[in-house]
């Protein structure tokens, strides 16, 4: 199903849905902490059509999980398509259930994700870690009356033990919940969010924000959203900047994102991003 040995220098190479499920089951049935730290690279796009997905990494208790994922998952620019989760009684719902100090990078997800609370396209919950160059195209929903922290990238970020870094990420999926954000539904402290954008509709019954729905920090920089994309009912982030559909379409937002990239010598991630033009903004 996979090649490699799961280390930083020789990560598992995964190219199929069967291989992805094998990895998920290895993490969720880990007998030692090291088994939750295994490293993965995707070598192909993966289609999960016909699969009701169970998340990678299990959130236990209120905010954290002993079987949370703590390794490095590198999508290598690939997409996990047709992700499907419909569990309105579950918390920590997403491709990953709970990430504890891990790294998720270079990954796009599409499909539909529904949970009770702590629900995200990439991860339902996170305590620190790094999420970079990730994109959510999923419709993401959680309970709009209780709990209901919902985000395009991360549903709920506690950041009790680790610093959370989110950079070069975007959402174009529809996000709905009690506390809803295009990138993160709710986060507490110790986070830095930079160079991200939202062009998906975000609806929150308590709090809504284009980047973060409800939060306790203002460490947001160079983040943008499509004007009118947030259906706001209190709360929401105030550090992101609204841009018109014209500014998305004419390259203005693209250039702002490229200017904010960490590595000026690398290929600009914004050049590869979809949905930066009005013509592209379709699901």
Go through each PLM region and give its residues.
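Surface-exposed repetitive/solenoidal architectures
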Residues: 1-283
């Amino acid at each position: 199903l996979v090649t490699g040995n799961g280390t930083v220098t020789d990560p598992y190479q995964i190219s199929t849905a069967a291989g992805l499920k094998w990895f998920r089951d290895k993490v969720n049935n880990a007998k030692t902490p090291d088994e939750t730290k295994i490293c993965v690279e995707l070598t192909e796009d993966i289609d999960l059509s016909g699969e009701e997905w169970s998340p990678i990494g299990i959130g236990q208790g209120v905010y954290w999980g002993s079987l949370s994922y703590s390794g490095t998952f590198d999508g290598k620019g690939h997409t996990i398509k047709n992700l499907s989760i419909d569990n309105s009684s579950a918390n920590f719902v997403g491709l990953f259930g709970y990430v504890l100090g891990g790294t998720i990078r270079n990954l796009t997800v599409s499909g539909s994700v529904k949970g009770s609370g702590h629900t995200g396209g990439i991860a339902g919950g996170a305590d620190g870690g790094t999420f970079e160059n990730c994109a959510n195209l999923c419709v993401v929903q959680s309970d709009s009356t209780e709990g209901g922290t919902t985000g395009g990238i991360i549903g709920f970020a506690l950041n009790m033990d680790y610093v959370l870094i989110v950079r070069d990420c975007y959402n174009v999926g529809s996000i709905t919940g009690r506390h809803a954000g295009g990138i993160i539904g709710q986060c507490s402290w110790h986070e830095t969010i930079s160079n991200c954008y939202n062009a998906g509709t975000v609806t929150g019954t308590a709090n809504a924000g284009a980047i973060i729905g409800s939060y306790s920090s203002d460490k947001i920089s160079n983040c943008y959203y499509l004007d009118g994309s947030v259906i706001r009912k209190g709360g929401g982030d105030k550090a992101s900047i609204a841009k018109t559909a014209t500014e998305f379409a004419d390259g203005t937002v693209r250039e702002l994102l490229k200017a904010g990239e960490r590595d000026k010598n690398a290929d600009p991630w914004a050049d590869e991003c979809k949905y930066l033009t009005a013509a592209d903004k379709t699901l």
